[in-house]
């Protein structure tokens, strides 16, 4: 019987060297590679396909772009998804990729699932949270063999596998429609200033246009549906906003991130559309949700973000949180106007048919509310503090 292993394949160095390793070191007869398109550059997909066709036994490329936006990015927006300032593009993509790999593995009759993640990062956990829901063996060559980037480069050359990274510029890039991450090499030193060459989606503030770009974003039930009045599908909307915001230098993050294992890591990200959509959505929520809803939802959003970052999207709690979030978003419909200028994002205005805001009630010129009615409330505001003071002064 032919022993098959299904490998989550990106076309990069790590997953490419996994192919001969799985045969030579682990004894598998065939390696089935699966690439999942969640918005990577088309050229990257083509390169991965071409490389896999040469070095794997069978290759799948699965288009999951629309599914990724609809089922993973839109829930993230509704939850104001944020982990320590990170918009979690890689985090929410991994479970979807893992599920597609499992589907292909079952179709091919594979007995094992493999990934190219290291033992120091988060992705190993995100993949395996899905992989280990099956009865198939799970293999992680990078982790199990304790491989280094330098060793992989040499090994790839020995096996005729083309590599684009070098020992001098060994940073790793992961990209999907929501974010682009750049890490590794000299970037691991938190005191190292990243060279401008690592950025592709965003212009520097210095090179951004000298005129601001104003954008109107329409939301329906917490989900963005239009830019400047033009209705767009989810993937198309995020892609277009990436271009607009990135051109104006919006959407860069350089941060120290606490990984799941407890390690601190220096990470560089680009996420133009994510920056704009999350800010606009949160602003619209303030217009339509009650104070109590906003206060409680912050707790829910934080818990949701942690589960999403950890890759635990199949946890019952994750579904419970989504149920509350979805209910809260029923009224989050309206338009937010934003200004993008040389790396800065400014909310200019917002409107909603469900706004709890009343200009008439809050206006200094309005007499709709008799200000004297507030006197009774004011007398008892801070009442317990006054009682406490009297007790302490006895």
Swiss-Prot record:
| Location in the cell | Cytoplasm
Q: State where it is primarily located.
A: cytoplasm
> Which pathway does UniProt place it in?
Amino-acid biosynthesis; L-arginine biosynthesis; L-arginine from L-ornithine and carbamoyl phosphate: step 2/3
Q: Which CDD domains match?
A: ASS
Query: Which GO MF terms does the UniProt record name?
Result: argininosuccinate synthase activity; ATP binding
Q: NCBIfam families from the xrefs?
A: argG (TIGR00032), PRK00509.1 (NF001770), PRK13820.1 (NF010392)
What protein does this entry describe?
Argininosuccinate synthase
Source organism per entry reads: Methanosarcina acetivorans (strain ATCC 35395 / DSM 2834 / JCM 12185 / C2A)
């Amino acid at each position: 019987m032919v022993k098959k292993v299904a490998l989550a394949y990106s076309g990069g160095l790590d997953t490419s060297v996994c192919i001969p390793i799985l045969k030579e070191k682990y004894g598998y007869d065939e390696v089935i590679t699966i690439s999942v398109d969640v918005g990577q550059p088309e050229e990257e997909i083509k390169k991965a396909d071409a490389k896999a066709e040469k070095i794997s036994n069978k290759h799948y490329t699965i288009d999951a772009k629309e599914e990724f936006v609809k089922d993973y990015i839109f829930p993230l927006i509704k939850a104001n998804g944020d982990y320590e300032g990170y918009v979690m593009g890689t985090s929410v993509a991994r479970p979807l990729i893992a599920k597609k790999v499992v589907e292909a593995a079952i179709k091919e009759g594979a007995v094992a699932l493999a990934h190219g993640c290291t033992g120091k990062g988060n992705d190993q956990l995100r993949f395996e949270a899905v992989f280990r829901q099956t009865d198939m063996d799970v293999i992680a060559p990078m982790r199990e063999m304790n491989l280094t980037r330098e060793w992989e480069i040499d090994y790839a050359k020995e096996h005729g596998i083309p590599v684009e990274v070098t020992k001098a510029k060994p940073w790793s890039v992961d990209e999907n429609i929501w974010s682009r991450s750049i890490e590794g090499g000299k970037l691991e030193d938190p005191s190292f200033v990243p060279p401008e060459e690592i950025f592709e989606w965003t212009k520097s503030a210095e090179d951004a246009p000298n005129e601001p770009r104003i954008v109107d974003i329409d939301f329906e039930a917490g989900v963005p549906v239009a830019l400047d009045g033009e209705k767009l599908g989810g993937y198309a909307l995020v892609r277009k906003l990436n271009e607009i915001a990135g051109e104006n230098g919006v959407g860069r993050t350089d941060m120290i991130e606490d990984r799941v294992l407890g390690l601190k890591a220096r990470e560089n990200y680009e996420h133009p559309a994510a920056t704009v959509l999350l800010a606009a959505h949160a602003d619209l929520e303030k217009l339509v949700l009650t104070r109590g809803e906003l206060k409680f939802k912050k707790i829910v959003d934080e818990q949701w973000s942690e589960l999403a970052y950890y890759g635990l999207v199949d946890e019952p709690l994750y579904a419970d949180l989504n149920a509350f979030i979805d209910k809260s978003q029923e009224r989050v419909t309206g338009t937010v106007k934003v200004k993008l200028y040389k790396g800065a994002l400014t909310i200019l205005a917002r409107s909603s048919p469900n706004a709890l805001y009343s200009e008439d009630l809050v206006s200094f010129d309005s007499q709709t509310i008799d200000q004297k009615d507030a006197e009774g409330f004011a007398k008892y505001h801070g009442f317990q503090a006054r009682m406490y003071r009297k007790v302490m002064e006895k």
